Amino acid sequence: MPDAVIIGAGYAGMSAAALLSHAGRKVVVLEESERVGGRARSFRDEEGYLREYGAHSHRLAHKGIANEVFKRLGEEIDFLPESKDGKLIFRGRLWERPEGPIGFLKTPLLSIRARLVLLALFAKIKKTDPADWYHRTLLDFYRASFRNPEVEAFLPFLGMTIMCPDPNKVSAGEVIDFLKRVLAAGVGVGEPRGGSAGIFQTLSRHIDRGGEIHLRERAEKIIIENRRVTGVKTGRAIYPAPVVLFAAGLPLIADLLDQTLLPAAVEKYAKNIEHSSGLVIDFITNRPVTGIRSGILGVDVPIWARFQSSADPSFTPAGKYLSTWGIMLPWHFDGDASVVAGAEQKMKSVISAVFPDFLPAVVDERKMVATVMNGNVLTPAQSKPNRPDVECPGIEGLYFIGDTVRGDGCSGDISFSSAMKAADKILSDRKP
């Protein structure tokens, strides 16, 4: 009998399974798709391209939360050498991305007066406890002390760092928490060599030492008796276990158990989670279109880009070059094809403005609509204090992990963090 069953093989599920297996626990990972990775999955196609479900960076690189999981496993993520050539798109132009307070003081992005206001804002952020501002927006935080139209127009950049560019929507506490960690770490993001494939290969190796990964096997029911988990039922088998970690999006939990067993607050939260969506396009060219090795973020348009082949030739066959561009779709995107077409037109218009020779050089492209990009938009209502804890109240042995629960950080970091939190609780509460 396994010590734990993990439902879902994304960042959270695979990390938790690896940590538990590393500690000597027997685990079974259930994944309904044909490969591990969830929203960070990747594969090499028949032509030799490494395809990813979007491009995934890791905040704070070797000092970040993802690498903390690996350190616990006695490993390190193999990050590409840090590059300082990141760019911003603002007002239809490409700008050098400022690095640290000195960089923002010198940037021609803003007037001298606006730069000084922005530095004062950063100083205030460094002194502020995020806990005081989780329930207010970034715009609220800014307007409590400052008034400058240039800086206000630049605020989406701060929100975009945690993938919620609207300053009137994003939680100030979440932005403050992230920026304080960036300022302390002195590093922005890290790109793993070979993309996310290497991340999951390492996690799989640790799981295989004392556990199993079952692909194409969908969990149908979490078995609960007297408010205590006793196992998981799939279409193939029943897996008795004293611990179940649900590592899929929290809204899906209702499909696997009697909702009346959930605390009312958890049930309500799960039903009302707001996620983000995006359009991602992989562009292939026969020649380099830029030497940029780092990434690009949009300030006044919610766009981002990576030029993988500039830094890591393993992504493509010889003589081919890959770059991935993404643009956020409107909030509450409902699948409307005309909205996607409009977003694609906007993306390509921006590309043409900042790289006039780029699109004419494209020989192939792959479009993907990420219906769920970030499972949890970091609004005040969905900020860290308001998300459900990893340990389900009222159901012994049930844990929630992933980017929709109370982990630290943002996006994938929440998944890695929640996996560590759950593993710590399980290992401290249940001795072999």
Segments and roles (model prediction):
Residues 2-29:
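N-terminal Rossmann-like FAD-binding beta1-loop-alpha1 element of flavoenzymes
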Residues 21-46:
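Glycine-rich FAD pyrophosphate-binding loop
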Residues 41-50, 59-117:
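A conserved beta-strand/loop capping segment in the N-terminal third of enzymes
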Residues 312-318, 370-400, 404:
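FAD-binding beta-loop-beta segment adjacent to the flavin cofactor pocket
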Residues 178-230, 234-235:
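Helical element adjacent to the flavin cofactor pocket in flavoenzyme catalytic cores
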Residues 220-321, 389:
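Mid-domain catalytic core of redox enzymes
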Residues 275-373:
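C-terminal segments that line or cap access tunnels to active or ligand-binding sites in enzymes
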Residues 84-95, 101-177:
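Rossmann-like flavin
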